Amino acid sequence: MALGGGVFVTQNKVLPGSYINFVSASAASATLSDRGVAAFPIVLSWGADGKVFTVTAEEFQKDSLKIFGYPYTADELAGLRDLFLNIKACHFYKLNSGGAKASCAFATAKHPGVRGNTIMIAISASEGSTAEKPIWDVVTFFDGVQVDEQLAIENAADLQDNDYVVWVDTATLATTAGTYCSGGTDGNTLDANYQSFLDAIESYSFNTVGTVSKDDTIKQLFATWTKRMRDEVGIKFQCVLYKYADADFEGVISVENKLVGESEDTESASLVYWVVGAEAGCEVNKSLTNATYTGEFDVDVSYTQMQLEAAIKAGKLIFHQVNDTVRILEDINTFISVTDGKSADFSSNQTIRVLDQIGNDIASLFNTKYLGKVPNDNAGRISLWNDIVKHHQELEGIRAIENFEPDRLTVAKGDSKKAVVVTDYVTPVNAMAQLYMTVIVE
């Protein structure tokens, strides 16, 4: 008779033998999550309505014509170039809707928008074509750039849709040096579309969100939504707005500067693009205090020392001139209402990055490794304690926090059998910003 063997769930076997379980170590770890993802609603003259689409930095450089309707170097994409200087990816949403797609006898633009009016279809007789059996070469141009070529086509039904047009499969192909599509319109940007963006983006992960809207109602909408998402839903990110220091909240950053030559009526809020990207891409152990603006816009930095001090006290992120460079004066958010329960430390974006990193990482760790999987007993709570300690030690290793004492971290059973209560003490590190030096001359 063979000895018993196999795997076991409980130690209740009858036969003698070896019962061995082979299990993988848990894939979930306490490692730090990456930063560098933003979310941004924009007005476009090309693109699908009512949907979030994600673009990586590489895709933006290589495929901007296909995605946004303009080549990478176009003036219209200056803001997006600023945005992508410091991020890996961005979740976009087209704010304008209800536009018309350009069309001609042979094709209809893939997306609505006036950029569809630059589409041109050129058709010529293919080699071997005869009057009895015509064969065609069909070329698609977008803003003068050849973007598609299909050779030896017998009829329109044989054409394959491309990134720019959907073919009219019932069309009669005929020689044309260039037939333009027409009738494309951008549609309208409605206030409701901003809310649609916020609703759609809730299920995505990102580090910062922003808008260049100057409408106080829209800015208030973004600020209120950010506060709800952070405080009630538990999703940690920061929101960048233009001249909205009234938010008085650590989750909202207010950009103060306009561009050179802009009046109060013509302010573009263009610096929001760069700040959204820079804040999203800033590492958890870094600060943007004294960071150099590396974008394309000419920033108005005509502020006196008193105005700069007043801006800091009011919770405004402001750029100033340092020799020949434009730099961020201090990496702060709009929080200024200091209380015993919330100190001035919460006005530092570096501090908020650390706290957000902890909040997002530990939530992800718990939801992935523990939720519904690990018993809420002493062993399970010790495991969670170990993972949190490992996470915090990684933060301490990269000098994002200091003086971490594992013994002060507690993981206890909550009021119900399913609840776990964690009490955590962390001290975020901030970059040096002020030097107080006394020189004694002997």
Model-derived features with residue positions:
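A glycine- and small-residue-enriched flexible loop/hinge signal that marks low-structured segments
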Residues: 2-48, 52-60, 65-68, 72-375, ...
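C-terminal edge-of-domain segments
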Residues: 410-442
